[in-house]
């Protein structure tokens, strides 16, 4: 099977959100199964040092613009990577420009021209989020089946009021909204977790597209993301003070003590150390913490370390809390990979109280590293974290359902109480670390989906 991934992001080259992790990892798992998988990505200015072909492998026109496509390799692999070159992409960041609608329409049109004119002949074109939502529309005349993956329905892209000036399709095809176009015209739609696939069909999570999505029937399925378990491995992670695995979990406490020293906390194995690694945005549910600081800090012995950046309101929320409780709360308002890995490898509890979470990667890394997750029961969090039951030794974390500060506080207390029982907590950690969080299962589900679509080509 020949599959082309088209996306705006791809880890480790160009990453803002979780889509990049999918586009940078799922092709590797599919290639291990024998599929011929390639990726096409805008040639951003910050990719200038990436080794690539000296000359374009394809040159053509799109939207009255001259475009070039270079070929490279996904770092650390043999996966071919096509880079769409045009001055519109020669920036030092991916988003935050007024012409984003035009830029990603140009990218999508270039991909379409590349395929129309024989640049490559995939059997399946796998499109990701609104940036590539127009591609299924343009592929209708091609012997190519299209899959459209919704990573986050809240981001539907800017409207395209000038669409008809550049392409020869009727305006009533949903093309004014690239997310809608992808949903309507693709051969199959996937969401990044089974629970999220169900949630987006409801008014609460459907972002005004729930009616459209309910009407898709079996075309919409949820396939849970995985993580790169080779790259994310506490046994080899160079950022940790001490490496460990399930057979040497007792060594993990050294990472906790080192983290406490790093942030000026009381150094004690008996203090519950809570970690947060996240974008600080409304989706992540941190507004639930605002009413809790005084109550939680005065009635608990927990320590909290936060790593992330984003909305100024949430940065202020954590900065002010750290100033109020300097011995108990620390906030690093940036993103730093070594610190993130030290939090995963040293925190006892990992907090994700998300308002909604299409899939989530933080809770899976936490499970992999033995940091017990405390999450809200939504989206991919509900598909990966299961409530601990001390009676039957099942479950791997703590969940609360109702989006309410009191519910979150009650679960924090419950987790701290469970932490007192060290043998039980260790078994909780082991259940998380032993789970298969790799891309293997996801890759098999996607391969089956591709196969079923190709069979329809005849």
UniProtKB/Swiss-Prot annotation:
GO biological process, one term: glycogen biosynthetic process
Single GO term (MF): alpha-1,4-glucan glucosyltransferase (UDP-glucose donor) activity
Binding, ADP-alpha-D-glucose: 15
Catalytic reactions on record: [(1->4)-alpha-D-glucosyl](n) + ADP-alpha-D-glucose = [(1->4)-alpha-D-glucosyl](n+1) + ADP + H(+)
EC number: 2.4.1.21
SUPFAM superfamilies: UDP-Glycosyltransferase/glycogen phosphorylase (SSF53756)
Keywords for this protein: Glycogen biosynthesis, Glycosyltransferase, Transferase
Metabolic or biological pathway, per its Swiss-Prot or TrEMBL entry: Glycan biosynthesis; glycogen biosynthesis
Source taxon at top rank: Bacteria
Family stated for the protein in its record: Belongs to the glycosyltransferase 1 family. Bacterial/plant glycogen synthase subfamily.
Task performed by this protein: Synthesizes alpha-1,4-glucan chains using ADP-glucose.
Protein name per the record: Glycogen synthase
